[in-house]
Amino acid sequence: MAKAKFERVKPHVNVGTIGHVDHGKTTLTAAITNVLAKVYGGVAKDFASIDNAPEERERGITISTSHVEYDTPTRHYAHVDCPGHADYVKNMITGAAQMDGAILVVAATDGPMPQTREHILLSRQVGVPYIIVFMNKCDMVDDEELLELVEMEVRELLSEYDFPGDDLPLIQGSALKALEGEKEWEDKIVELANALDSYIPEPQRDIDKPFIMPIEDVFSIQGRGTVVTGRVEAGIIRINDEIEIVGIRDTTKSICTGVEMFRKLLDEGRAGENIGALLRGTKREDVERGQVLAKPGSIKPHTTFESEVYVLSKDEGGRHTPFFKGYRPQFYFRTTDVTGDVQLPEGVEMVMPGDNVKMTVTLIAPIAMDEGLRFAIREGGRTVGAGVVANIVA
């Protein structure tokens, strides 16, 4: 069956849900697609199809990142439902990096919880520029003062991480009641959609920069070849463009013979879009998550760099003890972890949780990087620090 061609008319904005486990992120995602389909047209998605994580379905915990799309009169939104469960922070890091804005879901019945803080911190570190708050389960709280108190707490928490807590939109609603079709709660979803439209500016795309796309997944398609998927970070990729595959292994070249998005064919993939790129003559085993596709010559793989790092405090879920020179954690760049050796500055013997520190890192495998690239520092899947590449050494 031939694929329908994707028409690009409205501005395309990437958003997603973040917040504590069981506060209603997936229910809200379902409610948005259902209510907006009703009001503006589009395809409704039910809870079960968004919560598509077979490994963990039994316990009702979402693991994988789900992509849905919906429209308002002026925009097309691609929405990722990020996992809330602490074991899957890895997906949060790849998911949150794909947002022009995030919807922070906080249950009015609970208020901010540990993962609420963790996700706000991660949003700050991975560069999510805007956050809108959806206070969920408000139908279960009768006390007006309690709602005000939770709102105040959430706003203060956001301000603590340098988001404009006092000024950002906060909608009080109930995702479940909206999903069940109750008009007053459906209106709150429309209000949320209006806030997305007005508060998140039309993204300034990095479309004029050289093409680069971090690889998230690799598939082999019978008769067509190898497809790599990811979000285009900058530039444009067109059919028949030559590209380089950079990082982890020796740099190789390939030709892009096809671009698709949401199962529709495109002539090109642009910055900010989640696409699949078909690569000519590249074998499935020659490419892996953690590499990037890039315009030839535009980015080089490096192993050694100076960085500015913030080490999470114990309260933020970080380490409970200091670390010393010779520390060897994992450095999470874009979509993958690479082990690295840490050198501390002259005169610094140890680094305490909660400290800011300059460190020089030597990775065991090269990563495509430029100055300004963000990364997380992790130990056994747990985020213990966040940093930015300040200076490339080698």
From Swiss-Prot:
GO CC list: cytosol
UniProt keyword list: Cytoplasm, Elongation factor, GTP-binding, Hydrolase, Magnesium, Metal-binding, Nucleotide-binding, Protein biosynthesis
Catalytic activity annotation: GTP + H2O = GDP + phosphate + H(+)
Principal subcellular localization: cytoplasm
Residues given in the record as GTP binding sites: 19-26, 81-85, 136-139
Region (G2): 60-64
InterPro entries (alphabetical): EF-Tu_GTP-bd, EF-Tu_GTPase, EFTu-like_2, EFTU_2, G_TR_CS, P-loop_NTPase, Small_GTP-bd, T_Tr_GTP-bd_dom
Entry EC number(s): 3.6.5.3
Alphabetized GO MF terms: GTP binding; GTPase activity; guanosine tetraphosphate binding; translation elongation factor activity
Residues that, per the record, bind Mg(2+): 26
UniProt-listed Gene3D superfamilies: P-loop containing nucleotide triphosphate hydrolases, Translation factors
Hydrolase listed as a keyword: yes
Start and end residues of each stretch annotated as G3: 81-84
Span list, region G5: 174-176
Chain residue ranges for the region called G1: 19-26
EC main group: hydrolase
Region feature (G4): 136-139
Source organism superkingdom: Bacteria
Main function: GTP hydrolase that promotes the GTP-dependent binding of aminoacyl-tRNA to the A-site of ribosomes during protein biosynthesis.
NCBIfam families to which the protein is assigned, alphabetical: EF-Tu, PRK00049.1, PRK12735.1, PRK12736.1, small_GTP
Subunit annotation: Monomer.
Protein family (similarity comment): Belongs to the TRAFAC class translation factor GTPase superfamily. Classic translation factor GTPase family. EF-Tu/EF-1A subfamily.
Protein name, entry field: Elongation factor Tu 1
Organism: Pseudoalteromonas translucida (strain TAC 125)
Taxonomy of the source species: Bacteria, Pseudomonadati, Pseudomonadota, Gammaproteobacteria, Alteromonadales
